Amino acid sequence: NEQSGKSQTVIVGSWGAKVS
């Protein structure tokens, strides 16, 4: 799950919106 979230963040381009 954590890995998926990180990948999604990179794709989205929002290194904070997804993480937060």
Swiss-Prot record:
Residues 1-11 have a biased composition (Polar residues). Keywords: IgA-binding protein, Lectin. The keyword DNA-binding does not apply. Residues 1-20 are annotated as: Disordered. GO terms for molecular function: carbohydrate binding; IgA binding. The keyword Transmembrane helix does not apply. It comes from the Eukaryota. D-galactose-specific lectin, binds the T-antigen structure Gal-beta1,3-GalNAc (Thomsen-Friedenreich-antigen-specific lectin). Potent and selective stimulant of distinct T- and B-cell functions. Shows a unique ability to specifically recognize IgA-1 from human serum. Belongs to the jacalin lectin family. Tetramer of four alpha chains associated with two or four beta chains. This is Agglutinin beta-1 chain. It comes from Artocarpus integer (Jack fruit).
